[in-house]
Amino acid sequence: MTLKASEGEGGGGMRTALSDLYLEHLLQKHNRPEPVSPQLSAVMEDMYTNGPAALGSPAQTQGQEARKVRLIQFEKVTEEPMGITLKLNEKQSCTVARILHGGMVHRQGSLHVGDEILEINGTNVTNHSVDQLQKAMKETKGMISLKVIPNQQNRLPALQMFMRAQFDYDPRKDNLIPCKEAGLKFLTGDVIQIINKDDSNWWQGRVEGSSQESAGLIPSPELQEWRVASGAHSAPSEAPSCSPFGKKKKYKDKYLAKHSAIFDQLDVVSYEEVVRLPAFKRKTLVLIGASGVGRSHIKSALLSQNPDKFAYPAPYTTRPARKSEEDGKEYHFISTEEMTRSISANEFLEFGSYQGNMFGTKFETVHQIHKQDKVAILDIEPQTLKIVRTAELSPFIVFIAPTDQGTQTDTLQQLQKDSEAIRSQYAHYFDLSLVNNSVEETLKTLQETFDQACRSPQWVPVSWVY
């Protein structure tokens, strides 16, 4: 049976309800006092200079403006990295390239991106190699003294953005990242709080719910999409090195991802912006899996065991009704002309043909189930996930994988291969993945997880709210 996904309808039905829920959540959160983050103490003293020989003089010399120089002192009491990367600017001056959120320097709050470093513990950074300075910084214990020229540009407020990862990432295997040790490992489905995205290629973030407080580097959406589309093996642009004093690198590849239509054609995925909502009921349960994995059995069991909770939208078909079939029960029987008109009007969520007859599921039949305060069960093809994943249908998507136990027959191996193909392409849509070793256990886990999701705060696509 060849199925096609309909263009569908707008998400206006649920959008208002979820928008109101989100607004109420924000108001409640805003009225609560924010926790105070602990900071390390740092001593700062401002001086003025128009050159190295005039440190401490507040005056200006003829034709020159005095530059504000800040003396920063703080104590390094552990082996913890300082959490900064530096680079040489166009004047070959050493400047702060990035500050890792939650790291030592971020917590004591005295350095900022763009600050120019003049001295470290009384040693002028000019005329010293990067290796020498890096070694000195690493071996320094106790009090650290820095003379810096603060960056005068306006500092942006902290971000409040969360993204759901749509791919697995391990910085240890990434040849593009400027510092593997500073990278953040995550898996598909992890929610990442974005801390900083000043660098167009490397954002800073941390996995929500993780015990790790400090942020790590992650590829920006543009970089990840460029990487996937081009099969990149080299970095697309300059990036600060991992050492505290990074050397400039030049790369051959020119990064033009933002202006390329190739990503629309390839459907490249990276991250999805999400928001956290208070508990609300998911209105649709979607079962995804390869043909023969047991979705129909699971669907039938859910319907028979919970008739007051779940319902299945009867498909429409142009096939003639059999004697034992009642119109509107197993199927809605309509003419080919009616089916064609409804398809043209985008009334079908999914439609296709089988043995010369047309079949399809209408949005309206799903809505009717929702109006009865029941959960609609859909067992659709993976390509339809984009259509159903809206605030209007508010789906909970479950991927059913074949058993990994027992004898590996040719049929089972093919089923596992088909299943893996679906998983690799659509895993970023799944709310739950289950291996169907036992129908009873699968049903139990599915229902428990679904019920728990409806009772708990949930991360949903930002498009469901705005």
Curated annotation (Swiss-Prot):
One of its GO terms (cellular component) is plasma membrane. It comes from Bos taurus. Residues 71-152 form the PDZ domain. It comes from the Eukaryota. This is 55 kDa erythrocyte membrane protein. Keywords: Acetylation, Cell membrane, Cell projection, Lipoprotein, Membrane, Palmitate, Phosphoprotein, SH3 domain. Pfam families: Guanylate_kin, PDZ, SH3_1. GO terms for molecular function: signaling receptor binding. One of its GO terms (biological process) is regulation of neutrophil chemotaxis. The modification Phosphoserine is found at residues 19, 57, 110, 243. Residues 158-228 form the SH3 domain. The modification N-acetylthreonine is found at residue 2. Essential regulator of neutrophil polarity. Regulates neutrophil polarization by regulating AKT1 phosphorylation through a mechanism that is independent of PIK3CG activity. Heterodimer with PALS1. Interacts with DLG5 and NF2. Interacts (via guanylate kinase-like domain) with WHRN (via third PDZ domain). Interacts with PALS1.
